[in-house]
Amino acid sequence: LTKSVIYAIFLIDFSPARGVFLIQKNKSSSLQADSTVVPGAERRIPLLHGTDDPFSCVSESLQLVEENLVRAVRSRELDLTRIASHLIDSGGKRVRPMVTLLAYFAFGGQRTQDIVDIATAIELIHTATLLHDDIIDGAETRRGKESAFKKFGLKSTLVTGDFLFIKAFEFAGKFDETVVQWTADACTLLTEGEILQGHFNRNRAVTVEDYLEIVKRKTASLFHTGAKVGAYLAGAHSSLVDEAESYGLNMGIAFQMVDDILDVVGHIDLLGKPIGMDLRDGNPALPIILSVIDGDPATIGAFENGKPTEAQINAALDSIKTGSSIQEAKSLSKRYAREALKAVKKLPPSMYRNGLKSLVQLIIDRDF
């Protein structure tokens, strides 16, 4: 895949740190990481120049994940298969399993089927949360198609989400207690993040610190769990498992920040959903929070209104675009991206490490 094609794919299909960074504008958008390696981290890992994009690095393993997903959703109750397949077949770039696979191979992992199975579990959990999120939000579309909730109804979609959680642990349950516990912990964080987000729905008192806590749990949990499990199963030293976790955590936060920005400045044809959905739903997204903190009346009015009109939403979006919130949000997303890259530099050189670096860059470089 060429770089431009990869960017286009991310634009079409992307819809989910330790401490709080200060928001500041960066003089350069370049994200760099040097090639320093922690002593003792060197393993026999193949170097393959010219294939640094994350897709080609793990394309064969991702195909195995796809095959697992198809098998996983088969059921005697055809409605379960039909509803799950409706979302699984609608696309998505499988970023969470990609992180898991890249981390595993970057640390010298050799047992492909093992990591494919846990990557499948993580994607099944993510898919389950999407089904449940669409119910919570009353979403009519998902990935450019009618949402499962809209097409099949609340009850069947809810049960299908539960079904996918169960299937996820059929895969995760094959591993040792540590992996199972980390996977369960990720599910706990997801649910906590959803509840915490609800506390700040249409609440102008929400802060950036509150937002980060939501994102760490709701979005970043599967990213950092996938990276951590990948490193652990590859046999990495505990200090390097921590670095992998830091990579996933910071990348997941940056990912959500960019997603929030695109909800304001993106295009429906590329996003597969209307822009301004966070304002419509009252979600505490980063550009909205920053605009509310700045005291913008249009944003405050639309955010606090239980049923904002399209005119109110459009006025708020225009105000956010012309204010400083988008630039501040971009700056903060790049700050977290750089933290992810700091963790990557501790890995031994390989195409997989390069893939992890490129994945961060692709997320940050999505066109605004």
Regions found by a protein language model. Give the residues of each.
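All-alpha prenyltransferase/terpene-synthase fold signal
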Residues: 2-368
